[in-house]
Amino acid sequence: MHLILFIIFLISLPFAAEGEILRLNRDEFIETALKNEPRFQETRMAVLAKEGRVEQIKAGALLPKFELSMLTGVVPGLRKETDYYGQEVKAWDFTKMGPYFGMNIQAAQPLNFGQLQLGLRAARADLQQKKMEIEGKEQFLKVHLLSYYYGYLLAKEMNKLAQDGHKQMRKAADNLEEALDDGDEDASQMDLLELKAGFFEIDKAVLEAKSGLKKAQLAAKFALSLPDEVSFQPADSVLAAVADFVPDLDSLKNWAYMHHPDIRRLTAGLEATSMQMELASARMAPEFFIMGEFEYAKSWAGDRTSLSKNAFAQDPVNKLSGAFGVGIKYRLNFWNQWENYKLARIEHRILRQTESYANRGIELQIEEKYEDFLVAKSKLESARNALRATEGMLKGAAMQYDLNPSKTSGLLASAYKKNLLMKKDYYFAVYEYNMAVARLFAQAGY
């Protein structure tokens, strides 16, 4: 029984030591990494603060001042006395303390609804400006994260190529050694030495591929904020060219004019500064408001005559009063509002100046990235055609090797080496093409 438990324990050790693997496709990787980006967490909190500012302005449009105050305690009573002139007066009676209750209600409603609307529109434009700022940063952060994802797939392909190359070179060397041992006259010792000399490059490639794969794994874990016991694996098994449709240059420009985050942020900023100018100008005018107040106080102290029994009787303690009217407030320090107006006007002019060249600058950047995309696309097509050619050469060399292994081993090794190097160049071309598409889309805000 103890032996069986020991065997089960030994079998379960590899499974217990194996960490958890997180498999994500490209879009899931980007989404998860963006959620775990600490800098964007802070920026999103700033967006929430601006959303709260909008709600605060909306809530303050109706009865911004609506206060209720209440007080309860103990006060002295009142008694009637005759003064020096023989008149009856009321005096405090501290021998008869009693409970006291008082309340005061104040309410005010501004009538300058135009200013409230301007403030609300300015706050909404400021919120939109912040959202577009985040969206623009996310576009370029996605490019950085895509380099992690595609770089991981590229490292996997390089590792597979290096391992396969090492395996095939070892197999060719073993076959050549067998031919030499069998006394095959067509087998050459120089060919064997040449093969063995090439092992240094293969071993170097294997080590570099393993190191690159490890670095790519660490970069992906850092982007995803994964703990040490969790590793990342891309859902894609091979590095392939993205199938995303790439519009023509004019379509990308037209899209950018309408949807580019920087342009939309600039538009929102212009609207915000325009509203701030109007708001500063409006605040130099008087503000009208409606105000009301109600006050009630009652004491149950002193004598129990009709005055104290009447809930609305008024005396030095008991009160019942109210007021309602229309008021006006005028800011006499108009120079302060004038400075606010000038500041908003300067900021608005700066954004207007930026607008004059922003569209052209974005257009030129899109043209530059589109040219990079066309170059990467041409290189990928060229690499794909060259890869097909080396695969044909490899098949031909393999057929000749099957007919006469001893005489064609060098030809097979040369063809395999060319095919291996071409595969490496092809996968790098795929990586550059995918990144060129990502940079183009980010630049156009697509």
What kind of feature is each model-predicted range?
Residues 16-77, 124, 187-189, 228, ...:
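Bacterial Sec-pathway N-terminal export signals of envelope proteins
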Residues 71-77, 114, 171, 295-299, ...:
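Structural signature of outer-membrane beta-barrel domains
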Residues 42-57, 137, 141-162, 198, ...:
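Amphipathic alpha-helical coiled-coil segments
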Residues 21-22, 67-108, 237-245, 278, ...:
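Small/polar, glycine/serine/threonine/aspartate-rich low-complexity segments that form flexible
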Residues 1-32, 69, 82-87, 207-255, ...:
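Terminal intrinsically disordered/low-complexity segments used for targeting and assembly
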Residues 31-41, 48-65, 93, 97, ...:
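A glycine-/polar-enriched beta->alpha junction
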Residues 132-134, 138-255, 372, 376, ...:
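Periplasmic alpha-helical coiled-coil/stalk elements that build and connect Gram-negative outer-membrane
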